[in-house]
Regions:
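Short coil/turn segments at secondary-structure boundaries
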Residues: 56-59, 167-168, 277, 479-481, ...
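Structural signature of FAD isoalloxazine-binding scaffolds in flavoprotein oxidoreductases
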Residues: 74, 80-82, 110-131, 185-205, ...
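Conserved glycine-rich FAD pyrophosphate-binding loop
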Residues: 2-35, 41, 68-77, 99, ...
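Glycine-rich N-terminal segment of FAD-binding domains in flavoprotein oxidoreductases
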Residues: 34, 54-133, 140-144, 149-164, ...
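C-terminal substrate-binding/cap subdomain adjacent to the FAD-binding core in PCMH-type
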Residues: 2-19, 178, 197-393, 400, ...
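Extended, non-globular alpha-helical segments
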Residues: 31-60
Length: 518
């Protein structure tokens, strides 16, 4: 099969995207490997200014894939970032020699966005220091390669905490700000990207720039939620808050629609500090609600708890027992629900992470559970992001796709409070066009459980979910990398071409994260 070479930033003859398999509709492949032209001169230029490039197979192999485990590639070399000046030198040399630069933090992408198909991989984890904590102003300045859990450790020594961050211990701060960052308190506080007050950014041409809403605002708008296209974030100033443990409550539903309606009721009325939905298929739907303070919890119990239509754990168990007693042919499904409950639920109640009935560190608790009970060699997590009004429909349609492709799966739903003043940040991002007040996202995650599925099966599943987004005018949290063929279909040529023109102006050689979006 002949796949024609295309210039980065242009659309090839395939109606979906460059490098799509011609014989399989919307089947995506890894991009073609960069041919290595100019590599030796590029390395020589870097070493002349004191930037070390690791070229051993062992070092390069560490970065052969990402958390998704479905995309594989090898860089020609690896540079571990240690300073903005070093990153600047690298990008300047890359522009001269037209060497692709792939930036990687925690490597938690799932569609190959942080996998290098040749060129240089820039590992940001070498920049992982906390530079300053201002307890009075409630801000922190840190380097962008730091993991959120390391930032939390530093902050909590001062009785402080970040506002919202992904529920994963090995997400990097800079990588998170480039894609959004969703927490179970995002329906109240917004996504992680909205907590950034200022950034130090190295542009694709090597200029080191401090930017914020008031300084170099256009660059700030493009880098935040920019999927790494307009610069490398090297330092970040974030809003923070006093640390408080939280108290969790769980409500159980047998209906996705009812649970989502109750979730949105709480979000609209600011009735909880944390909220989200985690399911076992569509049979056991768990609405999680949590509070930072006794006063907020008491107000919820007085005004809102009685309006929820979910059950307590014991009541839901009785409901399920009656349901399956009348449907004995589904006893294997009931047995799976029971096994899953017995395996997963204790993770959220481990005594070492609780004190006086309060959860001390939600990131540790949720991250442990994710990797222990959802992680596998492949992480296939397509998603849909919609306005509040269309979310129920999106989840129900996505759920039907999950049932078609996999025996067992999990849905994770959460809201994101939007800032009207950050509308320019949200353009061509995971925030769906037209969403006001809140956007909502749902991850559709199959439970692999040791079974072997072909790459085509995974891809067909993802296509079926993403086609729903096209039909509904939605967006996605993961629309880059191997799924970038959907970008034009969702956002339209006019918007994509405008961003592509900005990308070409900012990155003349199209070297920075070239296979992620354009």
């Amino acid at each position: 099969m002949h796949i024609p070479l295309v210039e980065p930033g242009t659309v090839g003859p395939c109606p979906v995207a460059p490098d799509a398999l011609q014989g399989i509709k919307r089947q995506q492949t890894n991009p073609a490997r960069w041919n290595g032209e100019g590599w030796n001169d590029f390395v020589a230029d870097l070493r002349a200014v004191g930037v070390e490039v690791a070229e051993s197979a062992a070092m390069r192999g560490i970065f052969a894939t990402d958390a998704g485990g479905t995309a594989y590639g090898m860089p020609h070399g690896v540079v571990v970032a240690h300073s903005a000046a070093q990153v600047s030198a690298l990008l300047k040399a890359a522009q001269v020699h037209r060497v692709p630069v792939t930036v990687r933090g925690g490597g938690l992408t799932t569609e190959g966005e942080s996998v290098a198909y040749g060129g240089v991989l820039l590992d940001m984890t070498g920049m992982s220091r906390v530079l300053a904590i201002d307890a009075a102003a409630l801000t922190v300045r840190c380097e962008a390669g730091i993991y959120w859990h390391l930032l939390a450790e530093e902050l909590r020594r001062e009785g402080l905490d970040y506002l919202s961050a992904p529920l994963n211990m090995t997400s990097s701060v800079g990588g998170t700000l480039g894609v959004g960052g969703i927490d179970v308190n995002s329906a109240r506080l917004g996504c992680s990207a909205d907590q950034a007050l200022a950034l130090q950014v190295v542009t694709p041409t090597g200029e080191i720039v401090e930017c914020s809403d008031g300084e170099h605002a256009e660059l700030f708008q493009r880098v935040i939620l920019g999927y790494g296209q307009f610069g490398v974030i090297t330092e970040v100033t974030l809003r923070i808050r006093p640390y408080t443990p939280l108290r969790m409550h769980y409500y159980y539903y047998s209906s996705l629609r009812t649970a989502i309606e109750d979730l949105q009721l709480l979000d609209r009325n600011d009735a909880s500090d944390y909220s989200g939905i985690l399911t076992i298929m569509d049979c056991a739907v768990n609405l999680l609600v949590a509070f930072d303070s006794d006063a907020r919890e008491a107000a919820f119990k007085a005004n809102w708890e009685q309006r929820l239509r979910g059950y307590g754990e014991f009541g839901f168990a009785l409901c399920m027992a009656g349901h399956y007693a009348l449907r004995p042919w589904r006893i294997s499904e009931a047995a799976y629900l029971l096994r899953r409950k017995q395996a997963v639920f204790p993770e959220f109640r481990r005594p070492e992470f609780h004190r006086d009935g309060r959860m001390e560190d939600r990131t540790v608790v949720f991250s442990r559970a994710v990797w222990k009970h959802w992680g596998s060699r492949n992480m296939v997590i397509p998603d849909l992001a919609t306005s509040a009004g269309r979310f129920v429909e999106a989840v129900e349609r996505g759920n039907a796709v999950c049932r078609k492709y996999f025996r067992h799966y999990t849905l994770y739903c959460v809201g994101i409070k939007l800032r009207a003043d950050h509308a320019p940040h949200y353009e061509m991002s995971c925030v769906p066009p037209g969403a006001e007040g809140w956007a909502y996202g749902c991850e559709f995650e199959p439970m692999i459980e040791g079974e072997v599925y072909s790459r085509d099966h995974f891809q067909s599943f993802k296509n079926a979910i993403y086609d729903i987004g096209v039909d509904m005018g939605a967006s996605y949290y993961r629309f880059g990398g191997m799924m970038k063929g959907y970008i034009r279909r969702v956002f339209g040529d006019a918007l994509v071409d405008r961003h592509l023109a900005m990308k070409r102006a900012a990155d003349p050689a199209m070297i920075l994260n070239r296979d992620v979006i354009f």
